[in-house]
Amino acid sequence: MWNKVQETVNYLKERTNYSPVYGVILGSGLGSFTQDIAIDFTIPYSEIPNFPISTVQGHSGALVFGKINGISVVAMQGRFHYYEGYDMQTVTFPVRVMRYMGIQTLIVSNASGGVNPNYKVGDIVLIKDHINLFPDHPLRGKNEERFGPRFVNMSEPYSKELILKAKAIALQNQIEVKDGIYLGLQGPTFETLAEYKMVKILGADCVGMSTVPEVIVARHMDLACLGVSVITDMGDEENIEEVNHDEVLLAAQKAEPHVRQLIREFISAQS
């Protein structure tokens, strides 16, 4: 894994000469955030050594290098999911590459189902913690000490400092945000009524099929993380809504202008 990461980093450095400060992972229906970037390079995943290929609708499949208010960023237009058949090391490989490209902070976005009755479709939720119910773990196996320690402290997976900054940015820009706990399941099926009830009983506010593995690997390498969920459907155990992927994409796209603004202004404020 170490050699593959270094090979990929060297390729991207030679091609872009970039040392980004922020890495951004764009979830389902949120890919147009790249319109807010002064783009210098767009590299399809298919051209990048050792990179997997995104197979899910709503995930374009390219690394975008550019600047926001003069700050260097790299954005993933499309992520990789465990349910696509990739192992966890492959799902999280881009996070390791971005870390060794130079990023200091990882911003992760996703579309998720809400179980908190105070949520509604279209809400933006800042993730304050997560529950990991994936059947595999990205750090399972022999530890590579050059990446990070064998046992990772996960008491603060999402930086409290970054959450406070994001809330302040949201307030300044009149963007309504909530916070909550995200629960990660493998997918690709949407949750049953009983599973939504389980999510709620376990103490989560929303549920999705990504983010958790990426944040675990980011914390393994001591990266600060900010997580942003868009609520695209509601899982009320008394009145479950029928949902499909097209509806999820549509709901995410409707909320996207505010998500874009929040992330753009958050990064700009750090200059």
Give residue ranges: language-model regions.
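Non-catalytic positions within long, well-ordered alpha-helices that form the structural scaffold/packing
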Residues: R99-G102, K200, R219
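Generic non-transmembrane alpha-helical segments
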Residues: Y11, R15, E161, K165-E176, ...
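Zn-dependent metallopeptidase/amidohydrolase metal-coordination segment
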Residues: M209-E247
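His/Asp/Glu-rich mid-to-C-terminal helical/loop segments that flank catalytic regions of hydrolases
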Residues: G235-S271
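Short acidic/polar active-site loop segments enriched in Thr and Asp
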Residues: Q104-T105, D205, A224
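Metabolite-binding pocket within alpha/beta catalytic cores that recognizes anionic/polar moieties
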Residues: M1-M154
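Active-site rim beta-loop-alpha module in soluble metabolic enzymes
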Residues: N153-K200
